[in-house]
C-alpha cells in the first residue's frame, strides 16, 4: 500500500475533488484503515484485480466519511455507518469505461507507481553487480523512449562498448524489465488476467 499511496491521492484529488492537504490526510487515513481494519485480507486475485479492489474500497471509504460528516453537521453526533462494499464477485462492474474519467487518472498514477516498483527491483539487481551506470543508461531506451538514431552512439561510447553490443543489452534489459513488471503485479491479479493487466499498464504508460 505504501507504493500505491500516490494513486490513492490522485483519485481523491481528481475523482472526489479534495484539496491537496485534505487529499493527503485522507489518503493516509484510508491506508491506515485498510491495513489495521484487516480489509487487505479480502483482496483475492482470483476474484478481481487489486487495482479495482483498492479503488472500490476507496470510493466506499470516502462515501462513509461524508456520511459521518453530514451526521455531525446535522447535530446527531458521531455515528458509525458501515461502508457498503460491493460483493467480491462483482468488483469488475466498477472498472472505468470512459477514457477521460477521473478513474483513468488513478489508473495512470497506478501504472507509474507499478513501473517504479518494477524498476526498483531491477535496479537492486544491477546494484548487486556494480552496474548502476549501465542500468541508468539502459532504462532510458526502454522507459523513456530515447531516440535511437541520436542516442545509441553516445550511450555505447559512455559504456565503452559498440552499438551492436548496446542494442543487445537494451533488448535484454527490456526482457528483464517486463519480467520484473510481471513479478510486481503477479500477487495482485490472477494468472489468467496477468497478460491482460500487463497490456493495460503499457497502454496507460504510453498515453
Give the residues covered by each predicted segment.
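Intrinsic, short, N-terminal disordered tails of RNA polymerase sigma-factor systems
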Residues: 1-207
